[in-house]
Design a protein with these regions (language model features):
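Subset of outer-membrane beta-barrel
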Residues: 1-363
Length: 363
């Protein structure tokens, strides 16, 4: 379920999906649930996000995200979100090429989260997730009747927000950082006898610096590093080079048909990867982003994501902007590829988000 790792909101989207150390808002439940502890006592935010996905390839794939975050007591915070990923209209055919009907496969997840300040600067958070994937809509594939895939998972995270300190000319600075271990959960299965697939367990760590120039101008510079915690697929002797009749023989790496915890451990083992330590290093994805605020009302954002060419080659720049006025906030993000010689299905991706201060509405 790659959908579980797609950044849903336009604020982080405008910063190349940097989010683990970004200042807390309603979208914290996705990037770092621990940030919910710092949304503020008596504060309640609601958010909606919409992303047309892979528009260069298909016209009707889209990701929708609804969320809410609230401060609880002096040091707590809670959040909830619903994510819905529509794969558009697909015509199914049998092995003879005959149409079996037109359907709209989809995936969704429902999250709840709680966070607590452990000190004035540190917080911890945990979220629980129910995820559903209905890809084949009960069709017979490879002689097997498919079913809806379901799983449950959890995220565990921490967040650090330092004291502001004085700099020259009246400027102020603040260090921030965080760590999120997400999608720790059972494998997902689409048929009774078929193989179970890993969900995208992910480790995301990040740090940043908030620089307040004066009462009107503030700049944040942040970076995230991501690594999938699932075992790397081994290289198999598919061509039967040794003529022993076994085309499933592993000739480099280790068997990836292991349990969830064993898979997390194996994801760090260089000997389990066909290209050893070099491949382990290639599995880290780096995101860098910056955000400028004027008078806490208008924001401009930019970012860059780098992924190794052998691990997806998702390299792109992003830009975005945001507006806050009274109880409403609006954000927009746009993605364009870093390599203009290689066309990417993600190019020209846009994201829209709206944020509402629910406390102000209820007054």
């Amino acid at each position: 379920m790659p959908m579980l790792n797609i950044g849903p909101d336009a604020r982080s989207g405008g910063m190349a999906n940097v989010g683990v150390g970004l200042s807390p808002d309603a979208n914290a439940i996705f990037w770092n649930p621990a940030k919910l502890a710092f949304v503020g006592k008596g504060t309640t935010y609601g958010g909606l996000s919409y992303t047309p996905w892979l528009r260069r390839l298909v016209p009707d794939v889209e990701l929708m995200f609804a969320n809410v975050a609230a401060g609880v007591g002096e040091r707590g915070g809670i959040g909830a979100s619903l994510r819905y990923f529509s794969l558009g209209e697909i015509t199914f055919r049998n092995e003879q090429g005959e149409e079996q009907g037109t359907y709209r496969p989809y995936e969704m997840s429902l999250d709840v989260a709680y966070a607590l300040q452990l000190s004035d600067h540190f917080s911890g958070g945990v979220s629980l997730r129910y995820a559903l994937s209905d890809l084949a809509q009960g069709q017979v594939v490879g002689g097997q009747l498919t079913k809806v895939g379901q799983t449950v998972a959890t995220d565990v995270s921490m967040f650090y927000q330092g004291d502001e300190f004085s700099m020259q000319d009246g400027q102020r600075g603040q260090w921030v950082g965080g760590l999120t271990l997400s999608n720790i959960g059972a494998k997902i299965r689409y048929s009774e006898s078929g193989a179970a697939d890993f969900i995208p367990t992910n480790l995301r760590g990040g740090a940043g610096f908030n620089w307040t120039l004066d009462k009107y101008n503030r700049v944040s510079i942040l970076t995230d590093v991501n690594k999938l915690l699932v075992p790397t697929q081994p290289t198999r002797d598919l061509l039967d080079a040794d003529n022993d009749g076994d085309r499933t023989e592993i000739i480099a790496g280790k068997d990836d048909n292991v349990g969830v915890i064993a898979g997390i451990i194996q994801s760090w083992d260089p000997s389990a990867k066909p290209d050893g330590f070099k491949e382990l290093m290639r599995e880290f994805m780096v995101n860098v982003g910056t955000e400028y605020w004027y008078n806490e009302q208008f924001a401009v954002r930019a970012g860059y994501q780098h992924e190794d060419v052998t691990k997806g080659n998702r390299r792109f720049f992003t830009m975005g902007f945001g507006i806050r006025y009274n109880l409403i906030g609006l954000d927009f993000a746009y993605l364009f590829p870093a390599d203009q010689t290689v066309r990417s299905p993600l190019e020209n991706t846009i994201r829209f988000s709206a944020l509402v201060d629910l406390n102000q509405i209820m007054k």
